């Protein structure tokens, strides 16, 4: 909708359903259409915790999906739409505009430093001490070669995180 940056307060107001027109946040006179995720979504839980400061997201059941590809398609094809996906879905030309939060762009660098507020760690667990094969797999997953490939795909790697908590 032509809006390049929102304050966190504006983002919260949009996703909780209080702000419903882009003109109220510096955009055109156009209805805001939320493209949301179901309550069971881990991405939604992360977004609510870190982007919405724990506020409950206003669901739009007609545009609700747990499929990031479908979500992007819905945002691209719907006037006034806004949604959220993992940064990895925005590599290359995803056909959508990103929105900064408090003038901080959603980039890997800003995630690594903790400047961009919406991120979380993924975890791997073993039952007890890992056996030799499992240890080799974990070493590979946490290694530089694999990390470089993951970054090319738009995923961050824990070894580059300087921020340790929100």
Residue ranges: model-predicted function:
Residues 1-166:
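Exported/periplasmic ABC-transporter solute-binding proteins
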């Amino acid at each position: 909708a032509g809006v390049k940056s929102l304050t966190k307060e504006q983002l919260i107001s949009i996703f909780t359903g209080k702000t419903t027109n882009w003109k109220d946040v510096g955009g055109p006179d156009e209805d805001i259409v939320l493209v949301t995720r179901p309550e069971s979504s881990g991405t939604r839980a992360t977004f609510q915790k870190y982007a919405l400061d724990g506020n409950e997201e206003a669901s739009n059941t007609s545009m609700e999906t747990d499929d990031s590809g479908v979500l992007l398609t819905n945002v691209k094809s719907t006037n006034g739409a806004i949604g959220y996906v993992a940064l990895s879905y925005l590599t290359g030309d995803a056909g959508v505009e990103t929105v900064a939060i408090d003038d901080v762009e959603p980039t890997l660098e800003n995630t690594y430093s903790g400047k961009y507020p919406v991120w979380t760690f993924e975890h791997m667990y073993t039952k007890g001490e890992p056996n030799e094969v499992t240890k080799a797999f974990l070493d590979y997953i946490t290694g530089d070669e694999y990390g470089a490939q993951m970054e090319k795909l738009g995923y961050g790697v824990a070894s580059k995180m300087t921020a340790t908590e929100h």
